[in-house]
A protein has these predicted regions:
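N-terminal secretory/membrane targeting signals
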Residues: 1-20
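Hydrophobic core segments of alpha-helical transmembrane domains in multi-pass membrane transport
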Residues: 8-13, 37-49, 64-73, 103-111, ...
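Transmembrane alpha-helix boundary signature
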Residues: 18-22, 71-91, 100, 104-124, ...
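Membrane-interfacial helix-loop connectors
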Residues: 22, 68-77, 94, 144-189, ...
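Interfacial loop-to-helix junctions that mark the boundaries of transmembrane helices
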Residues: 23-32, 52-60, 83-97, 211-220, ...
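Hydrophobic mid-bilayer segments of alpha-helices in multi-pass membrane transport proteins
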Residues: 32-44, 54-79, 96-108, 159, ...
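Transmembrane helical segments that form the transport core of multi-pass membrane transport proteins
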Residues: 59, 86, 111, 116, ...
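Juxtamembrane and boundary regions of transmembrane helices in multi-pass small-molecule transporters
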Residues: 172-176, 188, 192-193, 202-203, ...
Length: 474
């Protein structure tokens, strides 16, 4: 792939002739088609400027999605082909609905575990442990890598960053290095699990990669994390920060909710692997598990409070006695309400926008330039670099919508690059953007950019490891 290919890919959306189309009405060279492309570019520019405009990222893409499909509907109505446009819209909406419900259940479980103070307990243990800064650098990185395959990488990164900020005592250099490490580790950990990132979930749901096959990316993902981490750790001092003796008690049912989450994941995998039903069926069943467990917690709360009150009175524990008065009954629907609705609605807007542009035929044009006329390996590496500038969700959905004829190894490669490519820049992933806000002034875009050579080295090493270790899948 030549150096001009990225430029040609962008220009192709605007100037290439309509030699391909996914729908029977050719719109790629029409004024409607070009307007829709421009509208999507404008909407995504507003998304990228979210931090500066204080504009939720879901708003521009929701408007763009609605306008794009209305214009498609008008064009097809003029040709007397409204049912074709309706069917295409419903097909795209179904793809979104399956992913949205899946993510909603996962977010609900994460919120439930947060409510039961699991993450607070982990943070408190790390803070009071008395580790020196270099050990904490490695611990937060390893924990981010290990937690993100199960929880989403955004939650994982925020949790680990909270630990770093607690112990750093204003050490800007350590905070910057630790946050870079956390972002890389969280993104790398999410790249080899269907549950670790929205893009891996999309690939699994689309049937391009089976559940067990994702784990062939474990070593490449691990190298993506370790290479820059080793280089950055040399700059982290061995200073021991002042320990904090905070102790966090888990709320009732915390460990059982973790067990139910694992059972939910197993149910989803079994539904997909053995019954060939969408994984969302298993996830929604898992939400039912949590609903009934929440019912049990609410009904048994008075008995539990009575036992604890008697125990604390017997031990003379006034602090814990007072805390009983602030106990709030567990409410599953409250956890659903606290899901990342901005992310879910943003996901709707992106899926519908990309689906609409694909129906017009633009994705076939890009697919021709990217995969048919070029090397798929270089194309998939470029996808990862593109993910560092543009959110990997629309990039991966576009690739899945193009549906290029690729071997399993290539699908694993694009899954890897889209997942870890966002670590190249601080704005390339949700984890990076969130940590710039959480550690404002200490973890910055330019602070991250200084370590781009080390991060890029890890990116290239992970790709090389995949091409070598999984060569039989190409």
């Amino acid at each position: 792939m030549s150096a001009l290919t990225p430029v040609m890919l962008l220009l192709s959306l605007f100037i290439l002739p309509a030699h391909a189309s996914s729908g029977p009405v050719l719109l790629t060279s029409s004024s409607i088609g070009l307007f829709c492309v421009g509208l999507f570019v404008l909407a995504y520019a507003l998304v990228m400027a979210e931090e500066y405009l204080q504009l939720r990222k879901s708003k521009p893409v929701l408007v763009a999605a609605g306008v794009i499909w209305i214009l498609i509907g008008i064009a097809y109505a003029q040709q007397g082909m409204s049912p074709v446009a309706e069917q295409a819209f419903r097909h795209t909406l179904l793809e979104y609905a399956e992913l949205m419900l899946f993510l909603l259940v996962a977010m609900t479980y994460i919120n439930a575990m947060e409510d039961r103070r699991l993450f607070d307990a982990l943070r408190a243990w790390l803070v009071r442990s008395g580790f020196h800064l270099r050990t904490l650098f490695w611990l937060t990185g390893w924990l981010a890598f290990c937690i993100s395959p199960m929880a989403d990488n955004l939650t994982t990164a925020l949790l680990m960053c909270a630990v770093v900020l607690k112990v750093a005592d204003g050490d800007r250099r350590f905070v910057n290095l630790a946050c870079i490490n956390i972002v890389i580790a969280a993104n790398a950990g999410g790249a080899f699990s269907p549950f670790g990132d929205i893009t891996t979930l999309m690939v699994w749901q689309a049937g391009k990669v089976q559940f067990g096959q994702f784990f062939t990316l474990l070593i490449p993902s691990l190298l993506n994390f370790l290479v820059p981490a080793i280089l950055m750790s040399l700059m982290v001092p061995r200073h021991v920060p002042e320990a904090d003796n905070e102790v966090v008690d888990l709320k009732r049912g915390a460990r059982r909710i973790v067990a139910l989450f694992l059972l939910t994941i197993i149910t989803a995998v079994l539904c997909h692997s053995f019954l060939h039903l969408p994984p969302v069926l298993g996830m929604m069943l898992g939400l039912g598990y949590l609903q009934f467990f929440g019912f049990y917690l609410r009904k048994s709360l008075p008995r539990s409070l009575a036992r604890k009150r008697a125990l604390y009175e017997r031990n003379g524990d006034e602090v814990r006695l007072r805390s009983l008065g602030s106990v709030v009954p567990f409410d599953v629907f409250n956890k659903v309400a606290k899901a990342e609705w901005d992310t879910l609605l943003f996901f709707y807007g992106v899926v519908m926008c990309v689906g609409g542009l694909g129906f017009m035929g633009y994705l076939e044009l890009v697919s021709h330039w990217l995969y048919d006329a070029g090397d798929p390996t270089m194309a998939n590496i470029f996808i990862g670099v593109l993910s560092s500038v543009i959110d990997n969700i629309p990039v991966m959905f576009a690739v899945l919508s193009m549906n290029p004829d690729m071997a399993l190894g290539q699908w694993l490669l694009v899954t890897l690059t889209a997942g870890v490519g966002g670590s190249l820049l601080s704005i390339g992933s949700a984890a990076g953007v969130a940590l710039m806000g959480q550690a404002h002034g200490m973890y910055t875009f330019f602070g991250h950019l200084k370590w781009l050579p080390a991060i890029l080295l890890g990116y290239l090493v992970s790709i090389g490891a995949h091409l070598w270790l999984n060569s039989a899948q190409f």
